[in-house]
A protein has these predicted regions:
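Hydrophobic beta-strand segments of well-ordered beta-sheets in folded domains
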Residues: 65-66, 88-92, 142
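Non-catalytic C-terminal interaction segments of nucleic acid-processing enzymes
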Residues: 97-239
Length: 239
């Protein structure tokens, strides 16, 4: 027995050999369902047919005709390109927590990045920094990395509300341009049709930097002979 999909949106079962499901389909997780539930039911699991008669099911298709694909599993480049060519107007939301080290590597790379724009805040780093960027840098459509609902203490930036990281599809060659986007702004754009708002350096980031300074470890007080030795080092003649 294998999973089968039909015109209805509930998964059911069929004997092998009669499978008519989308070949791009991946097993749905709680992460998929949580994302889809942000959108009206009649936007979810929208069925499309290719000219060759293949059936494809878009995760979400908005009333403005934009397809949102929520990608958890690894995706081959040829399959990604096929989907982008088929749907044209689409964006990707990628689960940044699929592999244990993806998140930590991504945020570690941000500590080596340079800021190329203040409003919206945009970072630039080499496009080969970590598997996530290598896998998605060649996408012709916007990619949003989802690293969960909360910041973690080791993150270079701490936000108090869920944030997605947008990979700019027109990044210069060899570079990846990334911008933090509030999840509420993302949903306002694709549910309500409002403009996507990035995070400006002057307002939100200033508060973030203040929070980072408060959490920075303070120097340990000198004990024992350490004050004496420190004074001697300061007085040591230099040639």
């Amino acid at each position: 027995m294998i999973a089968k999909c039909g015109e209805v949106r509930d998964w059911h079962w069929a004997h092998r050999g009669t499978r008519t499901c989308d070949r791009w389909w991946e097993p749905e997780t709680e992460w998929h369902r949580a994302w889809k539930n942000h959108f009206p039911k009649d936007w979810q699991e929208r069925i499309h047919w290719s000219e060759s008669g293949e059936k494809h099911i878009a995760g979400v298709k908005t009333e403005r005709g934009i397809v949102l694909e929520f990608q958890h599993s690894n995706l081959r480049r040829d399959e990604r390109e096929s989907r982008e060519m088929f749907y044209q107007k689409m964006v990707w939301v990628v689960d940044g927590l699929r592999l244990k080290r993806d998140r930590s590597r991504f945020f570690a790379s941000l500590t080596r990045a340079s800021i190329v724009k203040a409003k919206p805040l945009t970072y630039s780093l080499p496009s080969n920094e970590g598997a996530l960027l290598r896998d998605w840098i060649n996408s012709h459509n916007p990619v949003f990395f989802d690293f969960g609902e909360k910041s973690e203490p080791g993150d270079p930036l701490l936000f108090h509300t869920p944030v997605l990281w947008r990979l700019e599809p027109r990044s210069p060659k060899g570079e990846a341009h990334l911008s933090p986007i509030l999840k509420t702004s993302f949903l306002n754009k694709y549910v309500r049709g409002l403009a996507l708002k990035g995070i400006g350096y002057s307002a939100e980031l200033r508060a973030v930097c203040a929070a980072l300074l408060q959490q920075a470890p303070r120097p340990r007080p000198l004990i024992g002979f350490e004050p004496y030795m420190a004074m001697k080092r300061r007085r040591r003649r230099r040639f």
